[in-house]
Amino acid sequence: MTMADQGSRFGQPEKICDIVLKGGITSGVVYPLALVSLAEKYRFSNIGGTSAGAMAAVAAAAAEYGRHIENAGFDRLARIPGELGPNLLSMFQPTPALKPLFDIFVAALKAKTKTGRIIAITSAAIGGYWLSALLGLLPGGLVALIALAIGGGTGFVAFGMLLALAGLVAGVVWRLVKAANTDLVGSDFGLCPGIRQPYSSRDGFTDWLARLIDEAAGNETGRPLTFGDLAAPPDGRPAIQLAMMTTSLMEKRPYTLPMPEDHRFVFEKSEWERIFPERVMAFLTTQCDRFTPPAGEAGEYYHFPDPARLPLIVGARMSLSFPLLISAVPLWRRDFTLLEEAERNKLRRCLFSDGGLSSNFPIHFFDRLLPNTPTFAISLDDYDEKRNRDDVWLPASSGSGSQLPVQPFDGLGGFLMRLLMSAKDWQDNLQSTLPGYRERIAHVVLKPEEGGLNLTMDEATIRKLV
């Protein structure tokens, strides 16, 4: 069955809507079944998102494209929770060089108490950098052994043991600093590139998402689904518009994907091979024009794809580049603000990081003076037992949702985090309280152990969220 299925619950929805999805890393597991539920009554015309919301947005766009294809469409999205439950952590695969650092991060996530967290971090650090720990331990250990052998007394033995302990700490700390300053920087400031690593037999999250997009779209052509495909679905069905945010760190500005055709960016093949699946790279290198750098830089460069040839997986990955956890996406362009022609001709490397740094909730994406379809939005919020009775709520009156909650913080770490969040989210927060916006935002509240950076959520927690 490849044509419209009148008997399917997704066959012919009478209503049309737009949807915008907020970012939130693993909090995005709440989206698939919410989209499935909406898809029973609505056809999605315009779909937008940021970060994890961008992942859900491309999945929704692919499902809308494949709505009438057997085992594809929203039937495919309905199976996502069962896949994520046992596999979420395994999808985040650090590079081999950064695996010890990632294991320290995971150990900290799994610990339930402050004391347990300290013990877990220490054990993971020593286990991950055991050679550096051993080399640091050796001098003091030798002093202690020699003192014991010659009967040097407890003072010399104690000195040797203290020296060994100090050496162990110094060795591990030195290796941690080296990993952060060298390995992490070399991985474009992210532990996980997104694709399967040599030590693993499982897909990384980019591999999984690329496959999900094709399966939801019913795409069996072997090439990735593109924004151009969404603009011209088969059988004369209406076009699907998809948009997402990304952030150019070197330019200190956001971009909406797909970019306009005059963007002037190029990508270098070997760099992108580290973050995109082979079949995606095969498509890009055959569809995108080669670029010859005027200054003769080494490498194999291609023009960034125009909207018609931009794969959905590339847009999603550029939006989902959570700093330090997921590596940034490199592009290159010339800087025409420079005075010297020789300098203007040189390619400058630009890192694209998480779209949530610029706008984590781009509810403005599809605004029009005279909208002809409603825009729904899903916001992922923090749970507060004094404020939230329901896990999901909508403004119930004209004044509901017009004010922002007062949210205290603790300590220096909380202060620094709140500074960052205030600078990053103030515009989204204010916009979400405006009349005409707040009435169409569904708020999903999550507890501290749910969503966010909690990569170690068990299957039961994930199923509860969805």
Kindly give the residue locations of the regions a language model identified:
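Patatin-like phospholipase
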Residues: 1-466
